[in-house]
């Protein structure tokens, strides 16, 4: 039901240069190079360039581990590839049940690290079912977000347990 809407929005974003076909294909269809990703232990997700700049200490500490870096924007993807050419950079599949489930079934991550306040309910619930540990790094909740999340107490509880 939502797929035509999602595809239409994607075309608008591509037309407005907010996405390209490569990024949108990875986000919507969980279309990745799973041969490389399957070998990785950690997924580190950041949304913006600022969040990417804040993960240097994490990447340095995990230097002997196989890491996949995931992002949300074209600019953070390009900078990620430039700063960490030896790591795999991808666009995170969007938080739809089928998308996340396909992606996580084809990977072998041990931990997912979410930078700042990236909270994706389907990602958290499905990764919990697959016994993946989720870690929120540098997370914070603004007063506005707290009010919004408190309206969904059951979901907030599930997320808080992660």
Residue ranges and their predicted role:
Residues 1-12:
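A hydrophobic membrane-anchoring feature enriched in long, contiguous, low-charge segments
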Residues 11-32, 38-162:
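Active-site and donor-binding regions of nucleotide-sugar-utilizing enzymes
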